[in-house]
Amino acid sequence: MTTMISNLPRVLIEEIFFRVPLKSLRAVRLTCKSWNTLSKSRSFRKLYISKRATREEESMMIAMMNFDLYSMRVVVDDDVDPSKAFKKKRNKKSIAFKRQPIFLDEQVKISQVFHCEGLLLCFLKEDDTRVVVWNPYCGQTRWIQLRYSHRPHKDRFIYALGYKDKESRGSFQLLRFVDYFLGAPKNQYFWYEIYDFNSDSWTTLDVTPHWCIYCCDRGVSLNGNTYWCAKERKAEDDIVDHIISFDFTNERFGPLLPLPSKVMEHEYEIVTLSYVKEEKLAALFQHYEADWNEFDIWITTKIDAEVVSWSMFLRMDTGPRIEVPHICEGFFIDEEKKVAMGFEEDFDRKTFIIIGEAGYVRKLDIKAHVDRKCRPTVCSYVPSLVQIKKPARGKRKRQSSLEKRLFDQNMLRLEAFKKLGGYF
């Protein structure tokens, strides 16, 4: 007797889903109506997410390479011995590396990605007029039209995705701003605006920055807020020695919070933020020069909009025997395994590195053609139940006369700034 696919036992259907890679979930859900209904149930999603997060103790990440997104997993053996890190036979047994492409659309190329609570804010390589928010697990998307499009391939705006309601993790908003400061008040231009998912509208924010955030800093999301590396606006040097956050609930920036003072004594020029299980911030400190053989990673022991405290997670000082790898863009922390992972900043841009205690360094060739114009990046990722709210038809909030006037003023200021030679 043949059993129809729709009549398979639930436990068997669940096992099929658990074995399917993220990129194929949508196709499997659409196999039949009952499977699609099951996959959308809250109880099943919770079970699926729990199993995916713990299966084989894998570290799940989203990586961007070649203007495409990948679901990537790295399994680090519990028995990794840092003292044996440079013995090839031992190294080959300690790491398992997997990656699978996930497509928003096979024709759409991604130039940047920002992660918040399982949602991905994607910036398009060939379209500078809009961005898209995507939940890869649910297959939901929300396209957002920008009020002012940047120059193609030269986006100088900074973006952040967050939410107002900290209890339900709802009421999502998109922050967008540009801030140029060239040493004198007349040589500065800033414009801060926020998009509300519920009203489908943009609002200009009243912000006068006393800080400086560099346009190449993409920031990281933590508990609905976004954090960036920053410095005092009036500081004479370019050393980044603080972080700053944007609170989406109050729609305002918090105070400058200090990076760990001990590590700043090493005069690191590059500071990159990441997060640990969406609970803590992590800060990676590196030097510009390739011949430096040290770097530090610190993680927060307490973090909110007003207060921060730090603890050293990992320090590497190899001395002259080996150059410390330079991690490109985002990085991933496995707190239990005491390792950091990311793409190495090299010419070919196809080396993934894992760094641990006592000088442990493992380099993995991803064995793929790599577009050198695309800087690879990686971030932690856990599939999410968060729903992306669609705008109700005919419910778009009308732009007020005040908002129209503020927008026009910002555009006039922008044109004047360009005439002064401001790079935009």
From Swiss-Prot:
| CDD domains, per database record | F-box_AtFBW1-like
F-box domain residues are 2-47
Its Gene Ontology cellular component terms are:
cytosol
What Pfam families does the annotation carry? Answer: F-box, FBA_1
Q: Which Gene3D superfamilies match?
A: 1.20.1280.50
Cite the InterPro entries for this sequence: F-box-assoc_dom_typ1, F-box-assoc_interact_dom, F-box-like_dom_sf, F-box_dom, Gal_Oxase/kelch_b-propeller, SCF_F-box_component
Q: Which PANTHER family does the record match to this protein?
A: BNACNNG10540D PROTEIN, F-BOX PROTEIN CPR30-LIKE
Please state what the protein is called.
F-box protein At2g38590
Q: What is the lineage of its organism?
A: Eukaryota, Viridiplantae, Streptophyta, Embryophyta, Tracheophyta
